[in-house]
């Protein structure tokens, strides 16, 4: 067998990796989890369970919904429809085809259903099976997720954002004293289910407990307790303890002494031991809990109390007459003086009363006696009347309603999470499978609420991340599915009851349209299904990691208060405290922290390293906010010695509630994995984040997402080390699927022969077609460029091609430019930016934007529209860019007003004049009965046509252009097929050759003789086909050849089949919208150079607008003649407090000067002045141990590495663990620069030095998506508003500039009467005046008259609508 690693050692791709000098001190023990796995796990693993056999699927997601909805039975229980299994077919179109054809990327869901028909004996009621039919039923197309975690819906890429909502369970809170004027705290409890009715319990100002269902009218809580079946006695015994008062003759009552019930107070009577008669404390003396415990310990069991002490106490059981057992007073009644006399008269020796004291109030007892419902039936009817007002209440209806509210699994669902939360809060041990309320739940909720009122326990914090959970894509779609299937269930039952069940098949019962429409509606219109932010790869990743508190079932902007939006201590390591929008959504839309992940219950977890006996281990544990509260957690930058032990006497740790305490090392349970785990991906890309003010860091993270991909991008010289991870996970770059060797590379595709051998030992081939100049969702340009060369050995997951905004596998949102901080002639006033002409000339910040234009030829009432070059009344000049079909050529340069696609529409017949008749007779019909409805380039757009797509309806004949495009595409498919086949053939025939050489021929083609021994030369004279005709003596070899042939034929057949399928799909015509015959899409690419008015920003929230482009010779320059690229205002720093940008500039200055130093060393090495050792020594001094892998390689590779860093040395300064000021100074010294980072600058205009030293350095700047070209426009003529007759406003309406109230004041202030009159009349809404003015301009006259503005007429009409008849009377002068 041929060794596959024949030229592997050629050159591993990893040699091209960029090495950064890392300033971080903390070793990473955990990798950043895949940044988009939150989306993929939720949908593919948990909801669809895609590549799992149906027998191994867990009861979650789609499986659990189908299990819960089925079986469906009809009303008479004769037919029963059961669910067996489900599976997905392969999608009809792949992702690329869907986005091109404006379709949704979805797979057909096939569900196997079993319909059982029963025979019921009318006499005995016994049932037996009559028949079973099983069938696979199509249930609609379910959207699939692309490999990047997005959905393609109607051709556009969308993201479903995860939602933060209140976790199901029970929550206790108080009103913070806001409701009652006295400031009394009113406690309440709320049970929030995942779906179903809400249950609220609340105290009122009089300490009576009420409950509400779904915020309806309130009822006494004891009504609820009675409704669940509790009697008065059970209620009182459950919520209160009882104590017995025993009669002591002539002395009073003896009662048990309980020290726990004693609070500090002065005694009103003596404290007497009932057993001994000793007086322990006199009246007026003070007793404390401590003293009470002392007495109890000394043997005080019972105390004597006065006779009248019983007055005001409550009975804990019925008071009965000892003689005849007659009930004298009911349980719970208060003992009055009269009742006490009766007790004395009847000589009742023992009286049981409730223990009611400051630690346990009489709230339940008071509520019980306020409530008029005395039994379960009355309670249920009372609840029924509140929920169904106006309906007659009978016990069956009331019982059924109450059961359905909280105890029916179909209508009420706490979810597993809700049950776990409920059990932990109420200290219960109910199975997690019980997801409805139980009687124990309700009893204990009331108990905990009363305990809170009594001062035991604490209320819940709703903003704690243990009480908020995340609903990701899978769960959101699961809920929609459930809605759809419940609707479908109703229609199934109706169809079962309507038809003849014996002849019906499962597919006749199921109407999949109901389900499809619900899912479609969610993806198209839900607030959480959003148009993906595709400006650059970072904005894509951030969008997928976003957490929104808005949306259905969430908060609304207007009602969200400050607490919900604020940063909470539990956000640490879970939600980024920095990245959130400015404006009304602040704090409601958040980003997940870099290392965070979501657990199976929907709670966010953060990783920590376990600490054992003060020793930090490499074990990483993920904790949720609830679990974290139990531990003491140290910070990642705690000092650790070589043995991994925590150093120092005390360690600063976080404990529950977000407080920090100092503890000894052995008490620490965990430490953070890395300081970076606190912030999100965007914030972790900001170097020196720790030196920036938080508000500016917020702007920095948000503005990085608006950076436009440039034609040429640079990775930042000063990075944070996360750049590579972001580029890899974003999906913008192309990753190798398997280990392999690069066989072919061009700008459009990469062909790799993989090294993972198949069963037969043959290689497979991976072909990567790169995206070229594709339009993103935000009209930026998606373009991929290969990074590999032929012969490179690539490993699985290596980056083999850069995408937009990536550079050598690292994210690169902007460019490194040389900046100087100094004022320059006022041109950098208020954050304006001054740029050098070089930046425009060399396309440093030039970006490509692609616009899509579409034209549809429809079938109209008067006949079909036609795409043609034959357009009436259009000159040949205007048609110069169109082909014979009427569609523009690719590569044509177009500007506003040019025709892109010629189209004519039939127009209705109108009566024609004799002259027209004559013209028609002479010149034919055509020109008259159609009107021009061509697609023109809109105003403000110009550029080059880069792509044209033509879609024709099935059955409509394709035009030449469509056929040409199709042919091009088929050639591309054929090339992919041929290249793959060629690689396989090369392998197969080399293998055959190895097998055949040295064998003796028995039979073969004409060119070979029987009995000859085969040589390599002999085989060279044969064609490939003749190899298979050779038969040799060795039977084993012949078997092996037979196997190879079978595999080869199978592979070839599979390739041909795949090619045929693709071609068939391409030629089959398209599914176009109703009435459309043909759709043409034209893509125009526009180059946007940097110009005044464009917005630029750094990574630290430092943003500004370009004010002027200055010739290079006028810009300040360095002593060596280098011209500064950008001049920024130093006054933008002190008040903004984003000092990180200055440290970045200094380190950037070190970067380019170190690069110069390395270049100088290389030059000297080439001139033989120094040896390689000096270069190695300098590299070690600069990079430290990072560089060892390079230094072990041959000399030429070390020199090649040095050349790669000739523009600048790349640094990584991780967030909160990066370079300190001293490190920056050390680097500047190493580069031979002044440690202040400041230099002498020369003014380009005068040639003189500036008065003082200036901070100069390399800084990373971004061009933002707010381009002046898309904002500024001008109008000469255009549309007018119908009512006011004033020009419309805004760029989209091609409107004018508003001359508003304040502008009028300005002209009035100057007394410019005529200018003002002109503004308010002919230039605005004087209809006649403006027509006359136009005429006079045409005639070349310079005079005009102002008439009455239309707004005056509008005002008069408004007066008339108020019944005031105002007339304008014009008197002649």
From Swiss-Prot:
Catalytic function, reaction form: RNA(n) + a ribonucleoside 5'-triphosphate = RNA(n+1) + diphosphate
GO biological process, one term: DNA-templated transcription
UniProt EC number: 2.7.7.6
GO cellular component labels: DNA-directed RNA polymerase complex
Record Pfam families: RNA_pol_Rpb2_1, RNA_pol_Rpb2_2, RNA_pol_Rpb2_3, RNA_pol_Rpb2_45, RNA_pol_Rpb2_6, RNA_pol_Rpb2_7
A molecular function (GO) term: ribonucleoside binding
InterPro entries: DNA-dir_RNA_pol_bsu_ext_1_sf, DNA-dir_RNA_pol_bsu_external_1, DNA-dir_RNA_pol_su2, DNA-dir_RNAP_su2_dom, DNA-dir_RNAP_su2_hyb_sf, RNA_pol_bsu_bac, RNA_pol_bsu_CS, RNA_pol_bsu_protrusion
Domain of life: Bacteria
PROSITE patterns: RNA_POL_BETA
Record key words, sorted: DNA-directed RNA polymerase, Nucleotidyltransferase, Transcription, Transferase
Subunit structure: The RNAP catalytic core consists of 2 alpha, 1 beta, 1 beta' and 1 omega subunit. When a sigma factor is associated with the core the holoenzyme is formed, which can initiate transcription.
Similarity comment text for this entry: Belongs to the RNA polymerase beta chain family.
Protein's job: DNA-dependent RNA polymerase catalyzes the transcription of DNA into RNA using the four ribonucleoside triphosphates as substrates.
Name of this chain's protein: DNA-directed RNA polymerase subunit beta
